[in-house]
């Protein structure tokens, strides 16, 4: 789910934090991708009749189709993807997950009813709501990535939090996810729409955390408090508190502690805090998530050549994919992963801190240059003055 209305809040209050651009702009960059969110998006990319893509044996293959072709698109554009899979969810998230399960059960029932009596739009709408990523989906996607030579790692808990760690450490350029809560985990840069299909023609959104904080006039802790008020995966939102109200409350009171106090002491009782609302626990999960440090052995990764024949065996013979397309994809992987090794120019020219002696020398040269310019201007002004004073016709 992520954070409700957060993109809208940033767009309206810190527009400089958001850049929209083409996928080609990220040539030569390594990106950590929230795998579970990507797989979910592949699964809901259903046909208009509400059916998943399936093999001859009736197995769902939408996740594999999406993972194969969207990864190819990234590699074709010089991006080196690293997929990060979710681990066990934090205990505080269990309430939200239980609600999602209940909603999916209701949607399944509604989907069956819509197939009998509803319109095509109803069928597709409820079909999307029944989708969930299973262990089997994850396992098959991991197998596919290994055969493609694309690295993946397992996060202890939240994939977005692990992506953020890798981005902060400089092991990747950015974290990629549709979930805006990636920013709460302190990802310096969040990329959205990176795994969307080309047909959707959606630009890649690049969101910079430091610019968002600056535009909102908040520190990180206040930003997290704002996100909790907006509505996150860990807590139900406060009824009647929308994005504008949430922003106003944090700006006015500075912290959730003071917001809660103000709401509880309000004689009008305009807002009501849910009976069980452990916002401090939620904040702690954002501030100190269960992650592996970037230098942990399990966070080592590298891109390798695809295993072409094993890829054909898995996708063509087991899953019914077209052999020519799979072989063509493998050829593109081999070629473009080598091309992506050519780092961007910005990677070659990293700024190096200057010594005090070098700084003094540069300042001296700068001052000398200024003095020289002043002297030249003075001489030019004097020459012009003399030229004007000289009588016409004088030799």
From Swiss-Prot:
Annotated region described as I-domain, given as residue ranges: 122-253
Gene Ontology biological-process annotations: base-excision repair; DNA replication, removal of RNA primer
Swiss-Prot/TrEMBL cofactor(s): Mg(2+)
Keyword Nuclease among record annotations: yes
Subcellular location as annotated: Nucleus, Nucleolus; Nucleus, Nucleoplasm; Mitochondrion
EC code: 3.1.-.-
Gene Ontology CC entries for this record: cytoplasm; mitochondrion; nucleolus; nucleoplasm; nucleus
Region Disordered, annotated ranges: 102-121, 348-395
Keywords: DNA damage, DNA repair, DNA replication, Endonuclease, Exonuclease, Hydrolase, Magnesium, Metal-binding, Mitochondrion, Nuclease, Nucleus, Phosphoprotein
Annotated cofactor note: Binds 2 magnesium ions per subunit. They probably participate in the reaction catalyzed by the enzyme. May bind an additional third magnesium ion after substrate binding.
Region ranges (N-domain): 1-104
Protein residues bound to Mg(2+) 1: 34, 86, 158, 160
Compositional bias segments (type: Basic and acidic residues): 353-389
Region of interest (Interaction with PCNA), ranges: 341-349
Residues annotated as binding DNA: 47, 70, 158, 231, 233
Enzyme class, spelled out: hydrolase
Function: Structure-specific nuclease with 5'-flap endonuclease and 5'-3' exonuclease activities involved in DNA replication and repair. During DNA replication, cleaves the 5'-overhanging flap structure that is generated by displacement synthesis when DNA polymerase encounters the 5'-end of a downstream Okazaki fragment. It enters the flap from the 5'-end and then tracks to cleave the flap base, leaving a nick for ligation. Also involved in the long patch base excision repair (LP-BER) pathway, by cleaving within the apurinic/apyrimidinic (AP) site-terminated flap.
Quaternary structure, from the entry: Interacts with PCNA. Three molecules of fen1 bind to one PCNA trimer with each molecule binding to one PCNA monomer. PCNA stimulates the nuclease activity without altering cleavage specificity.
Protein family membership: Belongs to the XPG/RAD2 endonuclease family. FEN1 subfamily.
Protein name as annotated: Flap endonuclease 1
Source organism of the structure: Aspergillus fumigatus (strain ATCC MYA-4609 / CBS 101355 / FGSC A1100 / Af293)
Top-level taxonomy: Eukaryota, Fungi, Dikarya, Ascomycota, Pezizomycotina
Protein encoded by which gene: fen1
